[in-house]
Amino acid sequence: MQEQYRPEEIESKVQLHWDEKRTFEVTEDESKEKYYCLSMLPYPSGRLHMGHVRNYTIGDVVARYQRMLGKNVLQPIGWDAFGLPAEGAAVKNNTAPAPWTYDNIAYMKNQLKTLGFGYDWSREIATCTPEYYRWEQKFFTELYKKGLVYKKTSAVNWCPNDQTVLANEQVIDGCCWRCDTKVERKEIPQWFIKITAYADELLRDLDKLDHWPDTVKTMQRNWIGRSEGVEITFDVKGYDNTLTVYTTRPDTFMGATYLAVAAGHPLAQKAAANNAELAAFIDECRNTKVAEAEMATMEKKGVDTGYKAIHPLTGEEIPVWAANFVLMEYGTGAVMAVPGHDQRDYEFASKYGLTIKPVILAADGSEPDLSEQALTEKGVLFNSGEFDGLAFEAAFNAIADKLAEKGVGERKVNYRLRDWGVSRQRYWGAPIPMVTLEDGTVLPTPEDQLPVILPEDVVMDGITSPIKADPEWAKTTVNGMPALRETDTFDTFMESSWYYARYTCPQYQEGMLDSKAANYWLPVDIYIGGIEHAIMHLLYFRFFHKLMRDAGMVTSDEPAKQLLCQGMVLADAFYYVGENGERNWVSPVDAIVERDEKGRIVKAKDAAGHELVYTGMSKMSKSKNNGIDPQVMVERYGADTVRLFMMFASPADMTLEWQESGVEGANRFIKRVWKLVYEHTAKGPVAALNVDALSEDQKALRRDVHKTIAKVTDDIGRRQTFNTAIAAIMELMNKLAKAPQEGEQDRALLQEALQAVVRMLNPFTPHVCFTLWQELGGEGDIDNAPWPVADEQAMVENTTLVVVQVNGKVRGKITVAVDATEEQVRERAGQEHLVAKYLDGVTVRKVIYVPGKLLNLVVG
C-alpha cells in the first residue's frame, strides 16, 4: 500500500474495474428484495453543475447503502434530451440540435463516471431517440381512442414578423427575442390530454404518499384546486345566449352587482362590433400575456359591454363588463362579481363606480363598513330577502336549492387544474402522431407507420421549425388516402413523465413496458430531485403512472414511495460596478477576499484590482457567475472529496453553502483515514479478535465502534440525515487515531474498527473505500460486502454515570459499575474531591438513591 493518498490514481483504476465487471448492472431476481433508487434525469446542457452533483451523490449514497444491505438495487440514468435550449445552441453554433445533444451526452456521461456514480449503464435512455419516443407516440394514439385526447384552439405567443410561435421564455418585455417585434396572442389548434379526468384521484391519492414532503403535497393540492360550489345561469338582454358563472360563495349571491367576462368571450366580441373603446381593450388584452401568478397584483382594467344580465332571483338588471382579470381558458370565461365580499371585485367596482351591496353582517352583528375594503369573512346574511338571518352553510344550501328549483343553477365540483396542453410549435421534440385527411378528418397515425421519426439532419434558421418549413415532410398516406402529418411536437414533459418505467425494460420491443419487469421494480422506492418540479413534472409523473395502470401495464397506483427534494447549492456572489453603472459579476474563484476574526468576508477585489461588492451567498447561477465547476474540484481534490463534502456540509433537503475550506476539510479527513489504515497494515498480519480477552479500555473502544455502527445505520437508513452519519464516523476516527496499536488485541480491535469505518464510508467515498477494503484484507469487492452490523453485546454499558447531590444541589458526577450497590456508590462519592469537601464535619441525615442515576445526600 502506498503511503500517500493519490485520488487521481485510485479513482480511474476503480472506475475501470466497475466498468469491466459491470458491477452495477442488475436483473429481476424474485429471491431478493428490490430497491429502486432514482434521481431526476438531467437535461444534456453540456456540463454538469453542482446541483446535479448534489442530486446524484445523494442518490448514489442511498443506492450503495441499500446494496450493502443485500437488496437488488436498480439505479439507472438517462437524458431528458429534447427541448428548446438545443435549438438556440444549434443556431448559435451553426449545427443541428441532434449532434449538439449527442456530443453533450457523451461529455456529461464521462463526467458522471468520473464522479463514481454506481449506475446501471446498460439501461441508459436518451429521450430524443425513436427507440424511446415511439412508445410514447403509440400510447398517445391509444389515449386518443379512449377519448382522453382532444384538440381545441388555445392562445400562444405569436411573432407577426417571423410568423412563428414563441415559447414564454422567448418573449422579452412583450417583444420577440430575435427581432424585437411586439408579440401578439394568437389562437391556434392544439392537442390536450384530459388530466382533469383524473383530478379527483390525483388529489385523493396524495394521502397515500406518506413519504413525500408536505410542501409538495400542499402545492399539488392547491394546483388541482378542488372546490364545491354552484353553477348559475344568467339571461342577458339582447344577447342570444345565456352566461354561466361558477361560485364557491352562493351565500353572497344576493350581493352580485355586475358580471365580468374575458376579453375573448363571444359576448365581448359581439359588443365590440359597435364599441371602439371595447374593441381597443380586447386588442390590448389579446397582446398581453398574463401569468396566473401575476393576476392578483396587476392593475384591474375593464370596459362596460353595454349588455345587462338579469339576476335570476331578484330580477334586477346588472351590467356585464369585459375585464382583464377574467381568463377565457378558466371555467366559463365569465364570473359573478360581489364587490361587498370579494376584494378583487371591490377594487374593480370602486375604480369604475359600480354598486357595492353588502349582504353579510360583520362578526359583531352590525352592518359591515365597506368604505376601505370588502368583508371577505363568512357570516350571517342580511339584505338578502328570504335568506336573511341564515349563516354560511344554511345560506349556501338554501340559495343553491332555490336556484336548482328555478332551473338556473346546479351544484358543481370544480377544479382549478386545466387539461394538459401537449402541443409545441418547436422542432426539437417528438412528433405528435396524428394526421389530417384532405376532407379535414383527423386520425391517429396507424401503428404500422410508427414511430413518426423526427429528421435529425436539418438546417436551423432560428425562426421556423424545419419540419414546418419542409412541406414534403408532412405528406403521407393513410389507408391509401393522402394525408398531412401534424407538424407540432410534444411538450418535453411527456418524455419525463414515464422514463422511470422504461428504465425497468429499456430493450423491450413488444410494447411500451414489459409488465413483469415493470411490476418487479415499481414503484420507485426513492425519487430525488428539486422542489421546483413540485407541480409540473411531479403531477404529470403521477398522472402518467395512473394512465399506464389503467392500460394494464403497471399495478401500483403511484410511481414513487418516497420523494426527497434536495436543497439548492449556494456560493458567494461578487460584482463590481462598470463604467455605465452595470453590474459585472465576478466568479468567487477569482475573488481575493479579506475576512474578519469570525471568518466573515469584509473586503474583496479581483485580479484586475476592481473593488468588489459582496452580496452574500446565493444560488449558483450563470447570471451571477458564481457557479463552481465540479470538474475543476474533482481534478483538484478527487471525486470522493467532492462527494463527502456534498453530503457532510448540510442536511440533504436544506441549502448547501459551497465553501472551499470545507472541501479541504473533507480531503484532510480522507487522508487521515488513509494514513491510519497505512500505519495499521504496515505492521503486518493481525491476530483474530478475542472479545473475552479485552481490557476495560478495549471494551470501551469497541463499544464506541458498535454504537457508531448503530447510529450511522439509523442516520442513513431511517432518518436520512447523512451529515450526522459522517460526523459520527469522524468522531470515531478521532478515537481510533488515539488508540494504542501495539498489543495483539489492540491491533485486532483496530482491524475490526477500520473494516467497519471503511464500509460505513463506502456509500460516500466509494473509490478510496474500495482500495482500503482490499488493503485491510476484506473479502471480495467492497461493492458486494455486507453493511456492518452493530453487536448488541458490545454496546452494553458495564459502567454508568451517577449524579451526586448534597442537599439537592449537584456537586459532582461519578462513574460506577452498573451493578454497584448503594454502599459502593456512597463510598465512591466520598472519594470524589468535589463532593468530599461538602461532607467534611457534617452528619449525613438521609440518603436518596435512584439506582444508576442519582445519589442525594441530605446533611446537617
Curated annotation (Swiss-Prot):
Its recorded name reads Leucine--tRNA ligase
GO cellular-component terms in the record?
cytosol
**Disulfide pairings:** none
PROSITE patterns this protein is in?
AA_TRNA_LIGASE_I (PS00178)
What enzyme category does the UniProt record give? Answer: ligase
Which controlled-vocabulary keywords does the entry list? Answer: Aminoacyl-tRNA synthetase, ATP-binding, Cytoplasm, Ligase, Nucleotide-binding, Protein biosynthesis
InterPro entries for the chain: aa-tRNA-synth_I_CS, aa-tRNA-synth_Ia, Leu-tRNA-ligase, Leu_tRNA-synth_edit, M/V/L/I-tRNA-synth_anticd-bd, Methionyl/Leucyl_tRNA_Synth, Rossmann-like_a/b/a_fold, tRNAsynth_Ia_anticodon-bd
NCBIfam families hit by this protein: leuS_bact
- Enzyme Commission number, as recorded: 6.1.1.4
Among the GO biological process terms of this entry, one is: leucyl-tRNA aminoacylation
Q: Mind listing the GO molecular function terms for this protein? A: aminoacyl-tRNA deacylase activity; ATP binding; leucine-tRNA ligase activity
